[in-house]
């Protein structure tokens, strides 16, 4: 390893959503899982490589790099923007590694309260940077423009119909502040103008969702041809410039006249006036001109009467005249721009001669410059020169000077007659003509798009024309397809996890670009997840499926740089005993990674990973260092072949819980899972776990020769010894000490002092001890205490070169370096914003600490300067979301909520209903008051007092639509609404249909009865069955019961009718099956049979249990003599007091269910943190040691708690068990105890 190479961060793997972008400085930004990674361009001149990992806490939906990267301008120096899973848009500064500003314009209230409720996709909010550095973000209904400089945003309703277009991609033009392109799920590409808020072009052609868009400005094809012609003419002039010329008289100033007729001697297509201009006859000049220009002649316009012209003298003369004219300032200048010189009928690609780019807007001509116009005839037009054959597409260059008059645009054949035919113009040398023609090229803005079917299309955004297409032969649709421009002539696309290179050439016959496979670039990788192109260097960044990030040279197809990745939350680090440079990492994303520090260079971060079945919690190297054991989250222990990088086998432990401690000694792998210690014997053909039952509640283990050190869940440190002659048997603990209030987390042995070890736990104390093997004892050397009250140490690591240095990693986000030579000195503290899990000293340089945490992959910190400067703390990374300044809404234009047509219609309908209801209520109220006043006058005619009018306040309250209307009829009882559905209601009848006949259709039924038609009477008049036989009365009850069941009546009526028909059993059995029993059903069940009543009680108890009424259910179980079932029901639903009191009364004193209730009650109190109540119950149950252990769990031991612990220790005679480390003689236990 090069000692000068040091990466501060190890990047994380790419996330599930492929988001990557190339920074303007050549670096790579890509999104990981809840983080962003930046890798700088390959360093040069011995510079340090830069890798930055930034935790976002939430998943990322969109990522884009600002065009202002590296400019600063008083804001972030390296800004980029993301869209979080909570729909917030955040602007980050890569130089600071934190979010700076942002806005939450796309958030709704319920989403802002809890992000976990709604799971957004990448199409929820689309975001891209505009060319001016502002941010455009879009969702289904709104379009938000975020001004980064002022930290304000403006939200408008989108002009893209969400009903017709489901957006999948947005890319703003890097060449225009107002243009952006969006792709839809239907395969449309929309080019939109932000200033005009409309769709400029709508491109059709794709049949699958758009997956990628890329902009590019390229020179127009006709301009390239013109530049080639100008260069050829200049070369021809340089070859003939040495010929002698005759002295020439000073010619008159150059003039610009109107276009001449075809027979005019100054016609631009008449070349006779150019005789001897370059020292050659006319015929020879025509021949050479045709040869040099490929059959297309470039002519120069000449003034009248000048057969030969000395350009040098003309330039000097005109220069003097220009100086004189500027001094006099008499000439009125007319500015001519490129826009004024546009060709009227262009050929080549379907585009303007100009572009709407802001860059071209700034390239307007200035005084004294030379502008070039390109005239091109169509394929049907032809130009005849001196009677020769027609030559199609002849291009002619005109001199356009700034004092020339601007003619109105028209066809090349149309001539406009200005008021002044002649204007004086300055003359410029031929060299200036050629240079100006090269520099004034026209640019076309092309947009390439790719869909899910790998079909690419090129669009000309200047004219809205389709400019090219390739056809895919693949039938597989992919969502990871993407496209970039590598340069002006090469496009690179991603599909099927492969890169494809396409050459782009303009075809003049088809007036389109031809897309074909490019053979000069190649890439043979087939595991690419995402990529980004650095167009300035023509290099490609690749994010691969094997969790490596690399930069590839497309010309050679080889990886120039590659970087391994590690996910957040590395839970274990273990260096190989034979090769300390090889470090194994237990990752939280089902991987085991290997970091080979010896191969670390400026262009290589060597990390290889292997996929395993679950998250890895602990690691252990085999004695021969060829295999690695790992414990996982789901209770399995795997064995990995390091050389082949493959998992050999998976061993299942007795529990499906995390394996949080692992040791490999000889042929045995020891593990702890779910407070159980066991081991695997690898010599057996069928490997099964063996449980060690003599060790209770272990939390961590360490083996030293024949001694087993065990840290328990109660904070005790125990030592066990292997029985003589037995490899699998361990004696009960020989020695134990109470060190912590809670579980032991780590036991670390010093590599330079074989008997020194440190013990840490879920507490703020660290004990450094010395083991005495001959005496089977230990003694405390030092005790380090963290200054944080609620500290908890997750792991420790000793130095390999200095035996007095110890590293501890804390759950509150600290890494402390302790010095055993100066135990009273405060440690060097490295502060982070997340819990820290593990770490170590870098084997090659112990001035560098390598650590990992919950929101940290692997970070390397150099502490050399801090140690030399005697610093107390280092803060390498702060909370990235701590100092975000959220934007406010812009007040330039008020915001009105955007409603769709359906929502507006629904709102108007609700308003009409509310208004109509209000009118009815007011009318009823007025009518009621009139009736009351009339009644009062009638009852008391002598009272002449007028009724009071309605107060104005009451009328205004009635008009308020915001207030909830409390409409209740006069006959309505408010107490009835408060009653539960099962409460008794006063009912006047159970024959509702018969009552209806009497009240509403008595006359009609009477008419039927008077017809004396018995069949019609029996069919239509129910009340007639009351005056008939018993059979007819039963039919009446059956009809009424059917009606009651259909109407779901819950009163006593169905039971009352069933009692008379002797069908109560059927009624109750039906209610049991439907789980709709009530107490009245249970009360009536004994009238049928005792067995049915028992069934009803059990069914009703089960029904109440399902509804959550545990007390009701237990009561009915007790009534059936099912005491054990009722107590278990109380216990299962955490009714511990009720369960215990009934168990004391109903069960024998020796019943194990009583002890089960007490134990479950204690575990519940421990889980809720009520240690005082747990200790009280333990003392009452005569479990003094357990009560003492509960009081020790208090982190802040007050004098009151300490006094209670002393009393429990005294009463329970626990001095021999809880003696700590003070006695010199060990205290024995079990069969080896001394009496």
From Swiss-Prot:
Residues 234-248, 963-980 have a biased composition (Basic and acidic residues). WD repeats lie at residues 55-102, 428-469, 475-512, 565-605, 611-650, 690-730, 739-779, 788-828. A motif (LXXLL motif) lies at residues 443-447. Keywords: Cytoplasm, Developmental protein, Nucleus, Phosphoprotein, Repeat, Transcription, Transcription regulation, WD repeat. PROSITE patterns: WD_REPEATS_1 (PS00678). Expressed in the brain and salivary glands of early and late second instar larvae. Expressed in nurse cells and oocytes. Residues 227-263, 340-368, 963-983 are annotated as: Disordered. It is found in: Nucleus; Cytoplasm; Cytoplasm, U-body; Nucleus, Gem. GO terms for molecular function: mRNA 3'-UTR binding. Disruption phenotype: Late larval lethal associated with molting defects at the 3rd instar stage. RNAi-mediated knockdown is late larval to adult lethal; the phenotype is the same if knockdown is restricted to muscle tissue, neuronal tissue or motor neuron cells. Conditional RNAi-mediated knockdown in the central nervous system or muscle tissue of adults results in age-dependent decline of motor functions, including climbing ability and flight. InterPro entries: Beta-prop_GEMI5_1st, Beta-prop_GEMI5_2nd, Gemin-5, TPR_GEMI5, WD40/YVTN_repeat-like_dom_sf, WD40_repeat_dom_sf, WD40_rpt. One of its GO terms (cellular component) is cytoplasmic U snRNP body. Residues 352-368 have a biased composition (Polar residues). It holds the Pfam family Beta-prop_RIG_2nd. Component of the core survival motor neuron (SMN) complex composed of Smn, Gem2, Gem3, rig/Gem5 and one of 3 almost identical Gem4 paralogs encoded by Glos/Gem4a, Gem4b or Gem4c. Interacts with nuclear receptors EcR, svp (seven up), usp (ultraspiracle), Hr39 and Hr3. PANTHER family: GEM-ASSOCIATED PROTEIN 5. Contains one Leu-Xaa-Xaa-Leu-Leu (LXXLL) motif, which is usually essential for the association with nuclear receptors. Component of the survival motor neuron (SMN) complex that catalyzes the assembly of small nuclear ribonucleoproteins (snRNPs), the building blocks of the spliceosome, and thereby plays an important role in the splicing of cellular pre-mRNAs. Nuclear receptor cofactor for the ecdysone-regulated processes of molting and puparium formation. Acts downstream from ecdysone biosynthesis and release to control the expression of specific ecdysone-regulated genes such as Eip74EF (E74). Essential in muscle and neuronal tissues for motor function, including climbing ability and flight. This is Gem-associated protein 5. It comes from Drosophila melanogaster (Fruit fly). The gene is rig.
